[in-house]
From Swiss-Prot:
Belongs to the bacteriocin class IIA/YGNGV family. Inhibits a wide spectrum of lactic acid bacteria. This is Bacteriocin leucocin-C. Disulfide bonds join C9-C14. One of its GO terms (cellular component) is extracellular region. The keyword Disulfide bond applies. Keywords: Antibiotic, Antimicrobial, Bacteriocin, Disulfide bond, Secreted.
Length: 43
């Protein structure tokens, strides 16, 4: 499964494209904070 934030998972585990993920993690953290968890990873 590809979570669209630089993280993709298989049956063996998950891996992260850190260059892509850090931008999204930062954006999602801010948006999750502002919306009480209704944005970013939880949409």
């Amino acid at each position: 499964k590809n979570y669209g934030n630089g993280v993709h998972c298989t049956k063996k585990g998950c891996s992260v494209d850190w260059g892509y993920a850090w931008t999204n993690i930062a954006n999602n953290s801010v948006m999750n904070g502002l919306t009480g968890g209704n944005a970013g990873w939880h949409n």
